[in-house]
Amino acid sequence: MLLSALLTSVGINLGLCFLFFTLYSILRKQPSNVTVYGPRLVKKDGKSQQSNEFNLERLLPTAGWVKRALEPTNDEILSNLGLDALVFIRVFVFSIRVFSFASVVGIFILLPVNYMGTEFEEFFDLPKKSMDNFSISNVNDGSNKLWIHFCAIYIFTAVVCSLLYYEHKYILTKRIAHLYSSKPQPQEFTVLVSGVPLVSGNSISETVENFFREYHSSSYLSHIVVHRTDKLKVLMNDAEKLYKKLTRVKSGSISRQKSRWGGFLGMFGNNVDVVDHYQKKLDKLEDDMRLKQSLLAGEEVPAAFVSFRTRHGAAIATNIQQGIDPTQWLTEAAPEPEDVHWPFFTASFVRRWISNVVVLVAFVALLILYIVPVVLVQGLANLHQLETWFPFLKGILNMKIVSQVITGYLPSLIFQLFLLIVPPIMLLLSSMQGFISHSQIEKSACIKLLIFTVWNSFFANVLSGSALYRVNVFLEPKTIPRVLAAAVPAQASFFVSYVVTSGWTGLSSEILRLVPLLWSFITKLFGKEDDKEFEVPSTPFCQEIPRILFFGLLGITYFFLSPLILPFLLVYYCLGYIIYRNQLLNVYAAKYETGGKFWPIVHSYTIFSLVLMHIIAVGLFGLKELPVASSLTIPLPVLTVLFSIYCQRRFLPNFKSYPTQCLVNKDKADEREQNMSEFYSELVVAYRDPALSASQDSRDISP
């Protein structure tokens, strides 16, 4: 790709970013858009009503939202938004620090060295130069200047590992501080017990109570046995829809038609009162629900949520084998009540096993299927390939502006459009695997997305057109470093364009929230929107973290190969830091907490990125006829993996569970609290299946 084509892509995306930011700064001030750009604040403070008086300032773009987004401290984010939100922000902070250092070294040291090479001698003006002139490919084979890249790799690895260690330690400190500062939470005192043995003459509930009163008498508080409630939930969903419809009719938020004709197609029969009609249907559904609830007593599942009086008691029950038979009385930490994925208990073990096999096959098929759009995208990036495929377009493709747009902007845009449907698919696949909580489903989807992006967004793009037809390259591990060293630098221009298209424009479209804005406009146009019923969107950690980490992988691997990508990445992370602070404060609301457990994923992926950079460096120094540097690079991935193992042993156990020291100290602090009895009363029913709680919604509506 020529530098002019890259500049065209950057110019288009800069224009889109400026347009989106301008529109956002105006639209966010309009009272009618408060549920689009501030739903979290509306739900939290109930401030959905704003003055409708005309104000000229509302029509002028301003940047005051940036200042407000940067005002909250880390401690304020931790206390108001939760630990997961803080970890999400710290991923941006970590990336900004890494690529600030990388940009200084890459732009002021490595880039001039690359540019002064003579491997690609081109006597053109700067805009007509190829991107290869700014990459390590332009450095002459065997040149001593390559030792500068060698030293940069070692220094960069040390800096990344140091920052990673510091961030690990910081987040762990905040995780402990969050435990000490927060109020007692049900999941801290509760354990999920599965594999409850069947005892003749006893129900599941009686068996659980007898066991824990016998062996955990000092700390056992209560338990709730899980029931099969899938059929009841169907009735609940129908009742909820009917209740909302009845509420809208009575409030006048939809058509105030209070009567309709009964009979066939509403043309015959008596005039029926709509409110009375819906109320009777709702009453009948509630009667059916109560009947179904009364029949659920015999549909117990051999699992229960067991609550304890102390966190320490719950931790002991979680980490110690309960019965002689290791397949019975299985215990694990309970998720938050709102985090429980209740369909997990409906499926049998065999059904979950089959689902896992189906998910694995579907995931592999998706990886293979997405090679097709990758090949298409790489064909667009290559004018010669396009002319081969479509010879009748040769005249159009030779036009300067057309060729620059097609090679510089279209490939990354089309690839981004293909990727839009991937996150929902990964969430769907993960939900079929039998996870007990929504947070586990999101973590699984996050890992799947990372694998997908590594394969389809990186390796498939890098190898397509050069080594994709040689699938056996992966069966010969010795050739992998050389193949990657030859293929990766050639795709630098595509990934720079991808960063500005998917990164810059993607972030600006995130803050504009175009789809929710259009949906809000359409519902208001047809009079169907009700401010009381809108839903605050959940924080998209599982979708955004893979994208952030993938850009990190690009920056790390191209640090010494093509450092021109580094400032574009730094701009992306700075924009992301500002935009997502704004979105977390105003738009998103976490429905449940994972306790910062996304951070170990960030750590592992960063280590993988470093090792991949080292493997490419080994092959590249070999190709560049510098065998000594290639050999001296080999210890680097080994040292990096050893560092990762140390970090996992040092920090990972504290992410899986809290240490006894912290739990006992927190339990002692709770003993001095006056409202623990009230908390215990709430804890007893905290894990009651929502389907077993009788709906009283219709009773609360006055005629």
From Swiss-Prot:
<dbReference type="Pfam" id="PF02714">
    <property type="entry name" value="RSN1_7TM"/>
</dbReference>
<feature type="topological domain" description="Cytoplasmic">
    <location>
        <begin position="433"/>
        <end position="436"/>
    </location>
</feature>
<feature type="topological domain" description="Extracellular">
    <location>
        <begin position="116"/>
        <end position="143"/>
    </location>
</feature>
<dbReference type="InterPro" id="IPR045122">
    <property type="entry name" value="Csc1-like"/>
</dbReference>
<feature type="transmembrane region" description="Helical; Name=TM6">
    <location>
        <begin position="490"/>
        <end position="512"/>
    </location>
</feature>
<keyword id="KW-0406">Ion transport</keyword>
<dbReference type="InterPro" id="IPR003864">
    <property type="entry name" value="CSC1/OSCA1-like_7TM"/>
</dbReference>
<feature type="topological domain" description="Cytoplasmic">
    <location>
        <begin position="166"/>
        <end position="355"/>
    </location>
</feature>
<feature type="topological domain" description="Extracellular">
    <location>
        <begin position="383"/>
        <end position="410"/>
    </location>
</feature>
<feature type="topological domain" description="Extracellular">
    <location>
        <begin position="464"/>
        <end position="489"/>
    </location>
</feature>
<comment type="similarity">
    <text>Belongs to the CSC1 (TC 1.A.17) family.</text>
</comment>
<keyword id="KW-0813">Transport</keyword>
<feature type="transmembrane region" description="Helical; Name=TM7">
    <location>
        <begin position="541"/>
        <end position="561"/>
    </location>
</feature>
<comment type="function">
    <text>Acts as an osmosensitive calcium-permeable cation channel.</text>
</comment>
<feature type="transmembrane region" description="Helical; Name=TM2">
    <location>
        <begin position="144"/>
        <end position="165"/>
    </location>
</feature>
<feature type="transmembrane region" description="Helical; Name=TM4">
    <location>
        <begin position="411"/>
        <end position="432"/>
    </location>
</feature>
<feature type="transmembrane region" description="Helical; Name=TM1">
    <location>
        <begin position="82"/>
        <end position="115"/>
    </location>
</feature>
<comment type="subunit">
    <text>Homodimer.</text>
</comment>
<keyword id="KW-0175">Coiled coil</keyword>
<feature type="coiled-coil region">
    <location>
        <begin position="228"/>
        <end position="300"/>
    </location>
</feature>
<feature type="transmembrane region" description="Helical; Name=TM10">
    <location>
        <begin position="627"/>
        <end position="655"/>
    </location>
</feature>
<feature type="topological domain" description="Extracellular">
    <location>
        <position position="562"/>
    </location>
</feature>
<dbReference type="GO" id="GO:0008381">
    <property type="term" value="F:mechanosensitive monoatomic ion channel activity"/>
</dbReference>
<protein>
    <recommendedName>
        <fullName>Hyperosmolality-gated Ca2+ permeable channel 2.3</fullName>
    </recommendedName>
</protein>
<feature type="transmembrane region" description="Helical; Name=TM3">
    <location>
        <begin position="356"/>
        <end position="382"/>
    </location>
</feature>
<feature type="transmembrane region" description="Helical; Name=TM5">
    <location>
        <begin position="437"/>
        <end position="463"/>
    </location>
</feature>
<dbReference type="GO" id="GO:0005227">
    <property type="term" value="F:calcium-activated cation channel activity"/>
</dbReference>
<feature type="topological domain" description="Cytoplasmic">
    <location>
        <begin position="656"/>
        <end position="703"/>
    </location>
</feature>
<keyword id="KW-1133">Transmembrane helix</keyword>
<feature type="topological domain" description="Cytoplasmic">
    <location>
        <begin position="587"/>
        <end position="598"/>
    </location>
</feature>
<keyword id="KW-0407">Ion channel</keyword>
<keyword id="KW-0106">Calcium</keyword>
<feature type="transmembrane region" description="Helical; Name=TM8">
    <location>
        <begin position="563"/>
        <end position="586"/>
    </location>
</feature>
<feature type="transmembrane region" description="Helical; Name=TM9">
    <location>
        <begin position="599"/>
        <end position="623"/>
    </location>
</feature>
<dbReference type="GO" id="GO:0016020">
    <property type="term" value="C:membrane"/>
</dbReference>
<dbReference type="InterPro" id="IPR032880">
    <property type="entry name" value="Csc1/OSCA1-like_N"/>
</dbReference>
<dbReference type="Pfam" id="PF14703">
    <property type="entry name" value="PHM7_cyt"/>
</dbReference>
<keyword id="KW-0472">Membrane</keyword>
<feature type="topological domain" description="Cytoplasmic">
    <location>
        <begin position="27"/>
        <end position="81"/>
    </location>
</feature>
<keyword id="KW-0812">Transmembrane</keyword>
<feature type="topological domain" description="Cytoplasmic">
    <location>
        <begin position="513"/>
        <end position="540"/>
    </location>
</feature>
<dbReference type="InterPro" id="IPR027815">
    <property type="entry name" value="CSC1/OSCA1-like_cyt"/>
</dbReference>
